[in-house]
Swiss-Prot record:
Residues involved in Zn(2+) 1 binding: C68, C70, C83, C86
Provenance organism: Rhodopirellula baltica (strain DSM 10527 / NCIMB 13988 / SH1)
Residues that span the membrane, as ranges: none
Protein name, per record: DNA-directed RNA polymerase subunit beta'
Chain intervals with Polar residues compositional bias: 1419-1429
SUPFAM superfamilies: beta and beta-prime subunits of DNA dependent RNA-polymerase (SSF64484)
Reactions performed catalytically: RNA(n) + a ribonucleoside 5'-triphosphate = RNA(n+1) + diphosphate
Cofactor note: Binds 1 Mg(2+) ion per subunit.
Broad class of enzyme this protein falls into: transferase
A GO molecular-function descriptor: DNA binding
Amino acid sequence: MSIGETSNYDRINDYASVRISLARPQDIKAWSFGEVKKPETINYRTYRPEKDGLFCERIFGPEKDWECACGKYRGMKYKGMICDRCGVKVTHSRVRRKRMGHIELAAPVVHIWFFKAMPSRLGNLLAMKTSSLEKVIYFQDYVVTDPKDTDLEMLQLLTEEEYRAARQQYGSGSFQADMGAEAVRDLLNKLDLVTLSDQLRVDLAETGSKQKKKDLINRLKIVESIRDSDNRPEWMVLDVIPVIPPDLRPLVLLDSGNFATSDLNDLYRRIINRNNRLRKLVDLNAPEVIIRNEKRMLQQSVDALFDNNRCKRPVLGSSNRPLKSLTDMIKGKQGRFRENLLGKRVDYSARSVIVVGPRLKLHQCGLPKKIALELYQPFIIRRLKELGHADTIKSAKKMLERKDEEVWDILEQVITNHPVLLNRAPTLHRMGIQAFEPTLVEGNAIHLHPLVCKGFNADFDGDQMAVHLPLSIEAQVEAHTLMMSTNNVFAPSNGKPIMSPSQDIVMGCYFMTVEMPDQKGEGMTFSTYEEVDYALAQGIVGLHTRIKLRLPKYQKLKTDDESGEYGAIIDTTPGRVRFNEMLPVGMDFYNRAMRSGDLAKSISDCYQRLGRKATIHLLDDMMQTGFRESTRSGLSFATDDLVTPDTKLQFIKEAEKEVMKHKKAYDRGLMTGKERYNQVLDAWTHAREAITADMMSAMENDIRPGGWYINPVFLMSHSGARGGIEQIRQLAGMRGLMAKPTGEIIETPIKANFREGLSVLEYFSSTHGARKGLADTALKTADSGYLTRKLADVAQNVVVTMHDCGTTQGITKGVVYRGEKVEVSLAESINGRVSLKSIVNPVTDEVIVEANQMITPEIARNIEAMGLEKIQVRTPMSCDAPLGVCRCCYGMDMSTGSMVEEGMAVGIIAAQSIGEPGTQLTMRTFHIGGSVSKQVEESDIKTSRDGEVRLTRMKAVTNAEGRDIVLTRNGQIMLVDDRGREVESYDIPTGAMLMVKEGDKVTAGQVLCEWNPYSIPILSEVTGKIRFEDVVEGETMRLDREASGNTRMTIIDHKGDLHPQLVIEDETGRPLHAQYLPERATISVKEGEEVIPGKVLAEMPRETGGVSDITGGLPRVTEIFEARKPKDPAVIAEVDGEVEILSERKRGKRTIIVRSESGIEREHLVPHGKHFLVHTGDIVKAGQALVDGALVPHDILRVTGEEAVQQYLLHEIQQVYRSQRVEINDKHGEIIIARMLRKVKIENAGDTNLLPGSVMDRFHFRKANQDLQKCIKIANPGDTDYTEGTIVPKEAFEQTNAEVEAMGGTPAKGKRCKSATASTQLLGITKAAVQSNSFISAASFQETTKVLTEAALAGKVDKLVGLKENVILGHLIPAGTGFRIFQESEVNYRREALEELSQAPVSALEESFPLLGGDGEPASTTSSTTEGE
């Protein structure tokens, strides 16, 4: 290929795939430059390498550049000569990093990876136990390699005595047995993989036992993988060992005169010593025992070289630590993969402290002159030479050191339009590195624009940042067009602006837009903005005065439903007028006190209406305005501004009374200790909430002697500038309840606040929480980082690869409720998705959205306005793209608001979006200092609309007071309107007391039912007398003597066949009903007591209490993504149908039978101690929980299918994040879940050659079936050469038949092939990442040894489709600008476009970057893309 054809980068790296396989002995010799015969390294007197030693110059190349060992040839002129005296080739000393040597072994050894790493490949292949194999390899036992005519078995182990006895019995030469690696090699040589594979398949079809099947499949896998590769099994036994280049295992002379050496040299030295000794012994014809011992030691020393940690006794170094072997070099965080290949460092960068740069524009940063001078050095030198200030590089450098005047002028020129990258560690998401245009500043600190801080998560309390300089023109263009801070206005995780004002800016904007009564000039009317400005400047009106204003003709008032009219007269304040003057033309008039949320909203609005440029200007203006106004306001706060409400004491007294009341009730035995504890916590929580509410309103309406007063503390908190209600409550209200480190809540609250000061006791009880907060932070950061790493690894190769995969599947998205409140509206949950079907307005018949069209925020609002609850959209979880995802299934790129582009690395973005808040949230605990924010428990349901009551699936009994008590678990109250349509439905918990009857008319706000929030009652359904059964003290029940002197019976965790229950009998003693008692239930009746329906027999505590923060959340997220089975799982119904609970037990478990309408019966075994959620006669749906406990995602997948488990996992993840008020778009979770469900397990192989029970990628599986459909199975061969049952391609079949018929023979008959069937597997992310199709990616993640062993045996080929493999090999990643389409496209310029460009007035930016169009968008180019893989 001529130079002209190659593109601008080196084609040497342009290989498309990487293959790994076993090295043949001749390969190892071919790599080598000579045999290492001596264990010596270097001569301690001359410090020159010893000949034929481990550092020999003849083998590995010269120590000094262009100089042979003896010094006969010196200098470049002898390049390539081989010295006749010392045999060294004259060349560069760099070759000592490349040239390898070898060691010829006197006896073969087995590679430790193949027999010691579990599962043992050799053991599997030979069907031997690993322990037996080790006995043979380490010369303890003989193995029979050929029994000939004797009674011995093949592969039978014989001890020394047995071997001797057998030889005497059968005579020498009558059978063959051997030990050591030679024996293993003999056995491997005798394997015929093809027949073995057929035999195994036959055995597999015949066997019935599950374990046998598993073993056979494992063995078959290895046999087939070796058979299909070019490997021979005997290559696992080595004759020759490669020696790695000496500069990769250096020996360094220290100042003290000692040598520091790599551990590998010691390991090689042991091998060479033992090998040479073995040679001598063989030559001397030493006794067998001695030779055998030497061979064993050789095997052990080779094992230590390859993998020292797997040896029985690892070789120890000087300080009693195991030496680092070759395996340790590549695995783990410090190994080759993660330290050197994935963790490369930039060789020239600067770092310094950051300070705020309020005068910078959004795309700028301030760079200290020192840093700029150093970073831009080569560019400056080039310019100095061009301008003739310096002749040589050396003189130019001198000028730089002297800091001459010309240098500064040139520096100014060089930095224009040459962006720099700023990075702040930890870089948790892509906003951690952004590009800026540098401006030179004095001093040593980097100046950073305040608005980009949120993306970097930076503050100015001493944070440091690193500066990098993109060098090539491509890198500069990328930095400019893609990474510029102006392109990162919106967060890719949720599409909200990440560059929204905070702190002082918010405070300034809020202060200027606040209105106050009784100010100077109240009630004046103005016709234009200018008049208001004039009046304000003259002091006729104040900033907060209430005035009237006529809006300009082009502006309307901002309202939620966009109904304002243009040019209306509005009530506002001069401050708000000033704020709105700052907004660009085309925006509505925001007539409200601007809190941080409103400011963020205004930025989103601006972007949607006026585009990116206007938004950037708005951000800069908003910052200037905010800073200016907050300075002018002169806000600060004093202790007096922390207003404690006067009602505080009264609330505390009430709470204390309440606590006393509960204590008395407890003493009289009316409630359990647990109940009392919960009620006490509740009383204090109520008091605290009430005090807080009063405190906030007192601050809001703060009136001081001088009239109205803006309370600065309230202003900061309310505007969202700093400090939450939580913190103010602790300063001015009441600190409230504290948590112990266990998460339990201490029931005596802290009644004081920080302003009043804490007593010693109060201070002591708050140290718990504070300390836990700090400890948590330290521990959880690591966990969160690990989660991010696992997510990134599992999703790294998900890139947008095509426009539309053409799938017809999707997922249902709807409103998300939390309790009764709408947590996510429909518009929010479908925004940015692609609709699966077209949606038509039934009233007007207009198409709101077409099928496969993206739903914009506007369309989403229209769909919601139609009153739909759910719609179907495309999702990455059902995408059919064989690689990555397609644009339609992904939808909108959240950071730009338009359809995602091909080549976008959406997997990494998903991983960052989920992982980044994990780290954030782990760090959030300590700000509040452990004070508990316990939710007040709900204990009733109120209607939110009017309607008529319908009760569904409800079973109830009437108690003594005549109220209905609900018995069922899944009962619902539905409200219907006058047309009978359902408007609301509420799930009713067990044991709730109904306040309404069927058909009642209710109004909004009416109570439908009430319940005790702390316990679930177990109620009697019949009238009768109580008899206890299996309630045995000390075995199934414990008597709790409470402090009040009462005793309580509590059911405890029990083993064996006792099943505690309450039996209700009639007068004759006939049992009417048996009520099973679950663990932790307390019995509320006495033996022999008469009961009536609705009477409480026992109580179960409801799960409440404890503090929920994401520390509980992070492990939960990990648990979901790892698809772990929960500790104490629920049993779910396998089919729809009616429940019957059997009284007899199997193996100590109770049985629930579910009968479907079609008569299918399924038994469900329930471990004892579980609380049943269903009763006999209930109707259940498949997948519904029958007993308490967490659901198992694998069960959901098995019973109710993929969509159900997808929805479940997504919902669970979102619940954790939403409870922390972290918004993450669903699609990020969906991408990860799609990776977890990508593998299938072969159930029945059909006529394919897949292995039943093996796990594979669903697309490979689908392809295998599709290929099979192009074939035909021979049923009757006729006169053809086919045999019955073979599979042949259809074309060949037809052709052969045509030929046979032409000859007058009988054609073959064929039948359709049977496809394979498989079931979807749910894998945890770690497992999914390790099972990646790319062995390079998997090996660099975890379990390196295992992955590489497997890949080498199978001769795997890595196609380099993911990002990680390409990073490791130093290629461009196949995403973004490195994506196939962009790499292969050519740009054709349109003549007219070029002419237009040449006439347009050009900005400085465009001069340097002609690629940038007017709005920072690329200029239009027609690209002829060469398609095709």
